[in-house]
Amino acid sequence: ETGFSKATLTKYVTLLNDRAMDSGLELTIHLEDENLRLSIGAATKGRDIRSLFLENAVKYQILVYLLYHQQFLAHQLAQELMISEATLGRHLASLNQILSEFDLSIQNGRWRGPEHQIRYFYFCLFRKVWSSQEWEGHMQKPERKQEIATLEEICGASLSSGQKLDLVLWTHISQQRLRVNACQFQVIEEKMRGYFDNIFYLRLHRKAPSFFAGQHLPLGTEDGEMMIFFSFLLSHRILPLHTMEYILGFGGQLADLLTQLIQEMKKEELLGDYTEDHVTYELSQLCAQVYLYKGYILQDRYKYQLENRHPYLLMEHDFRGTAEEIFHALPAFQHGTDLDKKILWEWLQLIEYMAENGGQHMRIGLDLTSGFLVFSRMAAILKRYLEYNRFITIE
């Protein structure tokens, strides 16, 4: 599949094993005859594995270089990556094919496309690659702590550890992008034109100096920068439930789309006259993501292939056909990108939760006769599978 010779493949396997050992990662690739086998430790996370494989990948290095240097000259970047300009050109052409799903491209050594999409792409990428150590290092920075405290003050609520991590990643990306001249804010400003007078947005805007590590926002960019930040908060489960209710209570495009989705679900008798607050919250996040962004980086090839694998163990009714009818009536949910698959998967998770919202407790027995190591492995596999659904809690 890779097109590598066995000698080249062996060289890469040795390189990856050496790098894993140097970084203290419990990971080994075994090459046995014609078979490759991956062994990982119980503490090894998926993002650690992805980081190991991506670190020396040319396309990934191009993306990282662009974030921290804003632009490049082809001959200089080729020298830095120790490749020819022709090879760099081939990688850029291939990378642009991937980026087209996000309405983005790299042209003449610069990003081309809406600014909120550039930051969203980096957020999707780094969220799957950043190590725990990287996240913790950024969490300890005074400017990040101040940003968390400021947002908690505005919301009147504490953020969870996961919300803090996502906020830290987004603000780090935004801080790097502040150095870029002539960012394209027109698309996000047009999408969110109904929210410039929103009371929560105005409150957030007044606190602008407390974000972006205290950097001064260039003249004429403050509205665009703050609207991109506001859009991220609206769409990535950062804001608490009561804050989202407050924002959506003033109307706007997102509230309209949410109302349409709820109406379509009522037609299918999935919702009654009263919708639980946390269900409305989850639906609002799905609406915000499809309205504001395009594209997604799937976690793995098979997770979202619903035609090959049903996402749940307990679901009595298959709602995929119902989902197709509902989303067909709402053009915003039909991007033709991998984001569609992610949104469908999360919507089905929510429907299963609603169908099983009695808080059903189950005891799962595991065979202990094979010893502790086998038991631990079985428990880890079971936990990974079930935790694909955020509405299942494992105690």
Model regions and ranges:
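A cross-family "folded-core" feature that marks the main globular domain of proteins
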Residues: E1-E395
